[in-house]
Swiss-Prot record:
Positions of region (Disordered): 1-112, 213-250, 262-321, 355-384, 581-617
Primary location: nucleus
Compositionally biased tracts (Polar residues): 236-250
Gene3D superfamilies referenced in this protein's UniProt entry, alphabetically: ARID DNA-binding domain
Gene name in the database record: SWI1
GO BP annotations, alphabetical order: cellular response to amino acid starvation; chromatin remodeling; DNA-templated DNA replication; positive regulation of mating type switching; positive regulation of transcription by RNA polymerase II; regulation of transcription by RNA polymerase II
Zinc fingers, C4-type class: 1241-1258
Family: Belongs to the SWI1 family.
Name of the protein this chain belongs to: SWI/SNF chromatin-remodeling complex subunit SWI1
Entry coiled-coil feature ranges: none
Region of interest (Prion domain (PrD)), ranges: 1-323
Note: [SWI+] is the prion form of SWI1. [SWI+] is the result of a conformational change of the cellular SWI1 protein that becomes self-propagating and infectious. This conformational change generates a form of SWI1 that assembles into amyloid fibrils. [SWI+]-aggregates sequester soluble SWI1, resulting in reduced growth on carbon sources other than glucose, reminiscent of a partial loss of function of the SWI/SNF chromatin-remodeling complex. [SWI+] can be cured by GdnHCl and by deletion of the molecular chaperone HSP104, which is required for [SWI+] propagation.
Function: Involved in transcriptional activation. Component of the SWI/SNF complex, an ATP-dependent chromatin remodeling complex, which is required for the positive and negative regulation of gene expression of a large number of genes. It changes chromatin structure by altering DNA-histone contacts within a nucleosome, leading eventually to a change in nucleosome position, thus facilitating or repressing binding of gene-specific transcription factors.
The protein's assembly and partners: Component of the SWI/SNF global transcription activator complex. The 1.14 MDa SWI/SNF complex is composed of 11 different subunits: one copy each of SWI1, SNF2/SWI2, SNF5, SNF12/SWP73, ARP7/SWP61, ARP9/SWP59; two copies each of SWI3, SNF6, SNF11, SWP82; and three copies of TAF14/SWP29.
Length: 1314
């Protein structure tokens, strides 16, 4: 009998089976095993089964396909490992609760050898052809199962039936549950079978079937095809009955191919009827041993390869000995088990050898790939690290990222500190902005993200960088970056920086690998600890067991979870306990009393499912850990091999290959020495000098200050003394607690002004001060020239010289002198001589002066230098009247210019040194001018006036002598503040100074832009300045204050202003006659006025300066701002009231005292022609205007007359309001200031109207001047307003008088028009 050949020569086997079922849990297990053997014949077996199932019916469909073509043993053992993803028949169970249902299933199988089952007759059955059992199903894609596949069981390693047999797993009956033992010993009247969770268990049912086969095989049948023993064509295919109920078969049924062909032809009509079973309503439960089943949730195991069919009552059964057959089968199973183990060990050895060979073959290939493509290895490592990081918990990921960030910050700060040390700028502390420390690493990375410092500066994104870092002062942040981080950024771009970056990257990668290793080791330790805890908890849990049967509590260490250990010895007493009665029609059944079932608490489906999921997760985790360990080992091996390869490669001799030169880069040797000097060392010395430069002390740290000593230092020619004195005075004058009194030390002001004049003279002539050549000094022996005070001293010296020469006189010595002695003629005695009187020699003064002048050791010294405007190189070519806002724009452009010279130091350029000293002097004068006592002395000081005049000339006429625009604007600010403080007592020295002051004041206004003209002024056609805005600054108000104060002093200031504004000849001026340089001043003044008016060729614009001054004063009055602020204009008036008052006063002075026809009586005759003729005859000879400027001012687009009238009404309303909450009414000075402003407004309107009429009468241009004046809107008050004003008792009488005069003028104009 051949057990390994599965060939079947039967052509058609048609079986009809009818069975009776009880109220039990029935399971239909449909498995199809296709063994593609070319030697097999195709058999078509169709069987039809009718069954009624009243409980859960489960359809389990599995397909196991084994490849043939190898030896017989390999047909039994399939070494292919289990892959759950490849199992196409892993279907879930479908529970259908059907009460008293008759289900008919028809299944067709292709290429399937259907054995004939030999069954102990539990019920009569008829065998017919064309029908098969209800659980045969071909799981091919062309044929679908009639049942819904919904099985949740996992296929246990997807073993084929041959492999199940090859494993030879036999279980002891003592390990079976109680119900299974009852079925084992209770005979064949029970239609229920137990479900065992083990795939490789041979049940006692199988042994009983083996005995029945041996008995049936010995009996003879009338059919010619029946044989007493199985031949080679009769296949015996045992299988594991793992389902709880297979097609309602009894426990002693067996799958076999052993059947006679005549048995298929014996069918009767009674085969379709159901025969009741004696053990009806026998409810048996399936006991599942879940400890030994780790992969299935239910007890249905889908490893059935054939379908048992009920044998009809007329089956030919033989009466051979069952014990002999069983012993043969047991011996065969033992042999198969030994062969299987040996084969499995051999296969394992072969697989290990193949794996070792593959690894050895892959190592050199991997080395080559690593050498050829290092970038790929690097990217692969990064991907591995990224995948490992993603698999970690978020908390671990955050912790690892924090460690990496800290390490990266540490490396950055070390590199930055080292770079600062190399540049001799050690980073002592982290910089702060607003008591907040700056994170240099974040700042550097953010700037690099924007493209670098140059790109951020080019695109002006420093404010955005500061906003990202939440810092308000971006300019300070920019300076910090340029001072500390910009050299580091340039260092990182160099070759050394690139190498340093690569080393940092390698270090960070190694650091990340070490972190990942530590984390993986911790996870492995935690996983092993959790696994041990799970195993201990599982072993301590109770498992259901039948009475008298002992189940092991824990699995053996060598066995897998869910596999029952196989008993090596089959019990011999098993045959004695089985009583089988084989009859042709009926089979006797032995009734065994059932013991009481022990109540065991079953686990719910949820608990079982949770346990299964936990086990699967644990297995997956272990598998991942093993894979990670293998990867790390491979990486370590690869690195070691690569290092060894690199070492060996370096040992080999270098081979140079000729190649085409591409992208040739010549070698560059950096010059460290220039003419033998180390440039780096010299730069370090310079940096040390700058860092050690002393910072000037503050005012409290200076101690006692001697102003007289400071004035003497200013007069010296020593640069250090001068700078120290200037710095001390600047710090002292800027301190509000200290006051410099010029009353006690007036020489201090003289020293400052004289030093300033000398510096301005040197600056204008490009003379470098404080630099003397050795040729300027004259050396002479101190004893060579002796100067005698008296003649007696000289004579005494000669006597001593003769004594020193031993009193020997030479006879012809010209130096000898004859001494005359008076004697008495009678006696001859010497007469007594009177004591000689010492007399001073009379020295010639001219000779002394000539001697001193010719002496090289004595220099001529003048107290004051010549005025700058009279120097030969100071001829005026242009007046630089740059507006204030334009100056600010120029300063900004100058700062943004990369080639600017604003950072040049005085030690580098002598011109910068002079500019700094002049700026210090102007600031000192500005600070000390705020004192009243000092302002009186300053306004009368001749040296200060001269210094101001020279400084104004250079700033306005020749500003190119200064180094930058910022210095020029600072000089203008200092001058306008100083003049504002001293102008109420200042007497202007010359007309040129007066003109320069006017140009200085006008330069702080904002002129209108004329697109038709090249200049910013319209000329005398309209007002040339825009109304002053609050956000423009306060320097325009200082200009208005200067003009108002200078106009208050009539002689000589007002006369100078009148001659300049009216563009008259200043030769007859008394004050100019007193000047020594009158002729030069006249020429310069005419030249300057022509430059300002641009009237070299014609006289059309002779009064541009007058128009600009009046326009500037009108622009200081905020008419539009007050009128637009209708809610509460009192605040604006309170802020601007002093400026408004000064502007109105200055305009009234110009209109009443400077404009001509001021003393004439204004009369309007009824006949305009007569008046015109009279005016022509009485025309003033000094009138040289070609335009009616007062009418131009009234009729301008700003509508000055209407604005002044509305301003007067608003001030009246403020004064007459009943509420006293306004700020103006609470102040005392407003009681006088506001009425004066009101009077000035009305008076100015009246004067402008009168002057307009007078100018027009003198010009004889337009006879309809009265109509034009009357047509100006809102120029005169209405009758109602005049009536309300006159009836208001709270209005000041002076205001009423001015309104009355204006009203009378209105009536006169209207009368003449009528």
């Amino acid at each position: 009998m051949d057990f390994f050949n599965l060939n079947n020569n039967n052509n058609n086997n048609n079986t009809t089976t009818t069975t009776t079922t009880t109220n039990n849990n029935n399971t239909n297990n449909n498995n199809t095993n296709n063994n593609n053997n070319p030697a097999n014949n195709t058999n078509n077996n169709n069987s039809t089964g009718h069954s009624s199932n009243t409980n859960n019916n489960t359809n389990n469909n599995n397909t196991n396909t084994g490849a043939s073509g190898v030896d017989d043993f390999q047909n039994f053992f399939d070494p292919k490992p289990f892959d759950q993803n490849l199992d196409s028949n892993n279907n879930n169970s479908n529970s259908n609760n059907n009460d008293n249902n008759n289900s008919n299933t028809v299944a067709s199988s292709t290429n399937f050898t259907s054995p004939t089952a030999v069954v102990n007759n539990a019920a009569p059955a008829n065998v017919t052809g064309g029908k098969a059992a209800n659980f045969i199903q071909n799981q091919s894609p062309q044929f679908n199962s009639p049942y819904d596949s919904n099985n949740s069981n996992t296929n246990l390693n997807s073993l084929s039936p041959q492999a199940i047999l090859a494993k030879n797993s036999i279980i002891d009956s003592s390990n079976l549950p109680l119900q299974a033992q009852q079925q084992l010993y209770g005979g064949n009247n029970n239609n229920n079978s137990t479900g065992i969770a083990n795939d490789n268990v041979i049940t006692p049912h199988f042994i009983t079937n083996v005995q029945s086969i041996s008995q049936n095989s010995s009996s003879s049948t009338p059919n010619t095809n029946s044989n007493s023993t199985p031949n080679a064509n009769q296949q015996f295919l045992p299988f594991n009955n793992s389902a709880s109920n297979n097609g309602n078969l009894t426990s002693n049924q067996l799958i076999s191919n052993y059947a006679a062909s005549n048995s298929m032809d014996r069918s009767s009509s009674a085969s379709n009827e159901f025969v009741p079973n004696t053990s009806d309503n026998n409810n048996n439960s399936n006991n599942h041993n879940m400890r030994n089943n780790s992969n299935n949730k239910t007890s249905n195991n889908n490893n059935v390869t054939a379908v048992p069919a009920a044998t009809p009552a007329n089956t030919n059964n033989s009466t051979s000995n069952a014990n002999t057959v069983f012993s043969e089968r047991a011996a065969m199973f033992a042999a198969l088990q030994q062969k299987q183990q040996q084969r499995f060990q051999a296969l394992q050895q072969q697989q290990q050898q193949q794996q070792n060979q593959q690894q050895q073959n892959q190592q050199p290939q991997q080395q080559q790939q690593q050498q050829q493509n290092p970038k790929f290895l690097q990217s692969q490592r990064q991907q591995q690290q990224r995948s490992i990081l993603q698999s970690l918990n978020p908390a671990l990921q955050e912790k690892i990222s924090t460690e990496l960030n800290n390490k990266q910050y540490e490396l950055f700060m070390k590199s930055l500190i080292e770079n600062c040390k190399k540049r001799n700028m050690p980073l002592q502390s982290i910089p702060e902005i607003g008591n907040r420390k700056i994170n240099l690493f974040y700042l550097y990375m953010l700037v690099q993200k924007f493209g670098g410092a140059d790109q951020v500066t080019r695109t002006q994104q420093w404010s955005m960088v500061a906003q990202r870092l939440q810092i308000s002062d971006y300019q300070q942040l920019e300076s910090i970056y340029f001072r500390i981080l910009l050299p580091y950024e340039r260092h990182m771009i160099s070759q050394e920086g690139i190498k340093e970056t690569q080393a940092k990257r390698i270090f960070l990668q190694q650091f990340l690998q070490e972190l990942l290793k530590k984390v993986q080791q911790q996870q492995q330790a935690a996983a092993l600890a959790n696994a041990n805890n799970n195993i201990n908890s599982a072993s301590s849990a109770p498992t259901p067991a039948a009475p008298g049967a002992s189940v092991p509590a824990t699995a053996a260490p060598g066995t897998e979870a869910g596999i029952v250990p196989v008993s090596a010895n089959t019990p011999k007493s098993l045959n004695s306990n089985i009583n089988i009665n084989v009859n042709n029609n009926n089979i006797g059944q032995q009734q065994v009393k059932k013991p009481r079932k022990q109540r065991v608490k079953k686990k719910t489906k949820k608990e079982l499912e949770l346990e299964r999921k936990e086990r699967e997760d644990f297995q997956k985790r272990q598998q991942k850990l093993l894979e990670d360990q293998q990867r790390q080992q491979k990486l370590l091996l690869e690195t070691k091999l690569r290092q060894q390869y690199e070492i060996e490669l370096k040992k080999l001799p270098k081979v140079y290959k000729r190649s085409i030169v591409r992208n040739y880069k010549p070698l560059i040797n950096r010059l460290k020495h220039y003419n033998g000097y180390d440039i780096n060392y010299i730069s370090k010395i310079g940096e040390k000098i700058d860092s050690n430069k002393p910072i000037f002390l503050f005012a409290p740290e200076l101690g006692a200050i001697n102003l007289h000593a400071l004035s003497m230092s200013l007069q010296s020619k020593n640069l250090g003394e001068i700078n120290t004195a200037l710095n001390t005075l600047l710090v002292t004058s800027a301190d509000s607690n200290l006051k410099i009194s010029l009353v006690k030390y007036p020489e201090l002001l003289d020293s400052l002004a004289i030093l300033g004049m000398n510096l301005l003279s040197n600056l204008s002539q490009n003379v470098v001060p404080y630099h003397r050549n050795t040729s300027d000094y004259y050396y002479e022996d101190a004893g060579s020239n002796q100067y005698y005070v008296t003649q007696h001293d000289k004579m005494v010296d000669k006597i001593f010289e003769k004594v020193n020469n031993n009193a020997t006189l030479t006879p012809n010595d010209s130096n000898d002198e004859k001494v005359t002695i008076l004697v008495d003629s009678l006696t001859g005695n010497q007469l007594p001589t009177p004591t000689p009187t010492e007399m001073e020699p009379d020295l010639d003064t001219e000779c002394f002066i000539s001697m001193q002048s010719t002496s090289p050791a004595v220099k001529q010294w003048d107290l004051l230098p010549e005025p700058i405007r009279f120097l030969p190189n100071q001829f005026p070519l242009k007046i630089h009247r740059t507006p204030y806002l334009t100056s600010l724009k120029k300063i900004k452009d100058e700062i943004d210019d990369p080639f600017t010279k604003i950072n040049t130091r005085g030690a580098e350029d002598p011109k910068v040194l002079i500019n700094d000293q002049l700026s210090t002097i102007s600031m000192i004068l500005r600070n000390i001018s705020f004192s009243d006592n000092n302002s009186r002395i300053m306004s009368r000081n001749f040296y200060l006036k001269r210094f101001i005049s020279d400084l104004l000339w250079l700033v306005l006429i020749h500003p190119e002598n200064f180094t930058c625009n910022r210095k020029i604007l600072n000089f203008k600010k200092d001058l306008v503040i100083v003049l504002s403080n001293i102008s109420h007592l200042l007497e202007i020295a010359s007309s040129i100074d007066c003109l320069l002051i006017l140009i200085l004041v006008i330069s702080f206004g904002q002129p209108k832009l004329n697109p038709m003209a090249s200049s910013s002024s319209f000329g005398s056609e309209s007002l040339t300045f825009n109304e002053f805005q609050l956000q423009w600054g306060k320097y325009q108000t200082f200009g208005v204050d200067i003009l108002a104060k200078l106009f208050s002093l009539e002689k000589p200031n007002l006369n100078y202003f009148k001659s300049i504004l009216l563009n008259k000849n200043t030769g007859n001026n008394l004050y100019d006659r007193n000047s020594n340089n009158n002729h030069k001043d006249k020429k310069l003044l005419r030249r300057l006025l022509n430059l300002y008016n641009d009237n070299n060729k014609n006289n059309n614009n002779r009064h541009n300066l007058l128009n600009d001054v009046v326009s500037f004063l009108f622009s200081a009055i905020p008419l539009q701002q007050v009128l637009s602020q209708s809610a509460d204009p009192s605040l604006l008036i309170d802020q601007f009231s002093p400026v408004i008052s000064q502007s109105l006063t200055s305009i009234l002075v110009i209109v009443q005292k400077i404009l001509p026809l001021s003393n004439e009586v204004f009369e309007i005759s009824e006949n305009n022609s007569d008046s015109n003729s009279n005016n022509n005859g009485n025309k003033d000879s000094s009138f040289n205007f070609n335009k009616n400027l007062p009418f131009v001012w009234l009729s301008s687009e700003e509508n000055i007359g209407s604005g002044l009238l509305k301003l007067s009404e608003i001030i009246l309303n403020i004064n007459n309001s009943t509420s006293k909450n306004t700020l103006l009414q609470q102040q005392n000075y407003s009681k006088v200031l506001l009425p004066s402003i009101n009077i000035s407004c009305v008076q100015l309107i009246k004067c402008l109207v009168e002057k307009s009429i007078c100018f027009e009468n003198c010009l004889n241009n337009d006879p309809e001047i009265l109509k034009k004046i009357a047509s100006i809107p809102n120029l005169f008050p209405t009758d109602l307003e005049i009536f309300q004003l006159f009836t208001n008792p709270s209005v000041d009488i002076q205001i009423i008088n001015q309104y009355q005069l204006l009203y009378n003028l209105k009536n006169d104009i209207l009368t003449n028009l009528e």
